Amino acid sequence: LLYCLFISELCDMLSSNDFNSSLAFSLDQYKKHDLVKADSIDLMNRVDSKFLFRLSELPKILEECVSSYSALQMLKTCVFAYKNTYFDFPDYHLYLSHHNKKLNRNKVRFRTYPKTETKFLEVKTKTNKGRTVKARIKIPIENKVIGEENAIFIAEQGITNPKTLVPMQMCNYKRISMMDYGASERLTFDFHLHYNCRYENSNERFDKEANFELGDFVIAELKQNKL
């Protein structure tokens, strides 16, 4: 049994190394842009299109996009860690609105960029026109719950009783971010997604047993001003 486990782990490691090599080769073919260039595209009011595919297909898909996009690069890497904490009301109102595909629905989250040690409070609204409108402010990296200033900002986005929002889910993942040469759209690839859900009536505790991952899938998102 131990031998079988060792062989299984060895195969997983070799497979991971092959994937990382293929991914690095695909990304090396891209022209690169920096964060200043990426931020020059104003897509805070946009149309989103999402796609799901197998992680093993990512290197090939990247190779097919190289003629149309450049890749964000910082500190000599094009693959970045993201950490999101999603907030909701105790009755899961925000989640249920999303699940039931209601329009004029919201998401509230903290987004942390470990590479640059920065953190933002973000409110995303899906309008009745099918557009995504995002508003965000920079917050201290140590913030974990909705404070007074955060609550004011959230209320300004049309969400009532923001002080009753509590963290419900944590999500960690890797992202590759692209922009087209016309500087009119972004394309992101999220993978190695890990989720951890909150339990009990606590602002800080997350259930280590209630976690799951989408290790074999990639979520691609195309962000455009219009279709």
Could you say what each language-model-derived stretch is?
Residues 2-227:
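Phosphate-end processing signature that detects enzymes handling 5′-triphosphorylated RNA
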